[in-house]
Design a protein with these regions (language model features):
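Short loop/turn segments that flank or connect secondary-structure elements
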Residues: 1-246
Length: 246
């Protein structure tokens, strides 16, 4: 998790709870309204086929595996020690406590997924939702030029094969499960933002970016633990993260 903190900077503006809540609701409405025939057509045109390279199961290629609440139930049944608070906590209050929208799978020292062995998933039949839909997606993000638009696939031309001639029923199923994942993810994010808003209002708290930055620097230098509240099933679970031992 320590390295992950170095990879992403969250601006003060984006950490306004109301702003992020509004954006998440708009994104959900956009996903729900995206034309199904268009999405199916894009999937069919791409014709992606997995070639079992396992690159998507590494931190270098895919950063982390975020878990929906339903995923966490399954993963904890398999191995409760295989999860950790997701990287990039969204908020930090004035007392230095962090708040993050969910859990992620742990990784091995080499950066590969904790469940990856010999380029194969040990829990394939029970793998998390994002692993089932990857590399497909349905959300808006900026391209290299900064232009924001809809994206339907990750890592284009970086793995797998393309133009494989998928049949219509397969494309429709891919579209269905991908849309379902994106909607579930956004609903979890909306629930998280609403829960943080209520918690902050009730307890006289607020997000303070300078405290966020200072605590992260101290953590990366091994000077402190982090108190992280992880959103799960409508509530927060407290986790204490210890700094990496050199």
């Amino acid at each position: 998790m320590q390295d992950s903190f170095l990879k992403k900077v969250i601006s003060v503006k984006k950490n306004n709870i109301e702003t992020r809540l509004t954006e998440a609701r708009k994104e959900l409405a956009g996903v729900e309204g995206f034309p199904d025939p268009e999405f199916v057509g894009i999937i069919k045109e791409l014709g992606f086929r997995c070639e079992l390279c396992a690159r998507c199961c590494t931190k270098e290629f895919n950063d982390h595996v975020f878990l929906l609440d339903a995923d966490l139930v399954v993963i904890r049944q398999i191995n409760p020690d295989s999860v950790t608070p997701a990287p990039y906590p969204e908020f930090c209050d004035q007392k230095g406590r962090f708040y993050v929208s969910g859990y992620a799978l742990k990784t091995k020292p080499d950066g590969s997924c904790i469940f990856l062995e010999n380029k194969r998933c040990k829990i394939y039949d029970r793998r998390p939702s994002i692993c089932r839909v990857y590399p497909y997606m349905l959300h808006r993000e900026a391209d290299d030029s900064g232009r924001v638009g809809w994206r339907q696939i990750s890592g284009l031309n970086e793995h797998g094969s393309y133009y494989s001639g998928l049949d219509d029923s397969e494309c429709e199923e891919i579209a269905r499960v991908t849309r379902a994942y994106e909607e579930a993810y956004l609903r979890q994010m909306i629930g998280f933002f609403e829960a943080v808003k209520i918690h902050f209002q009730k307890n006289g708290l607020k997000h303070v970016q300078s405290v966020y930055d200072r605590r992260i620097r101290e953590f990366l230098k091994g000077k402190c633990e982090l108190e992280v509240f992880v959103y799960y099933n409508g509530e927060f679970e407290k986790c204490d993260l210890k700094p990496h031992a050199d």
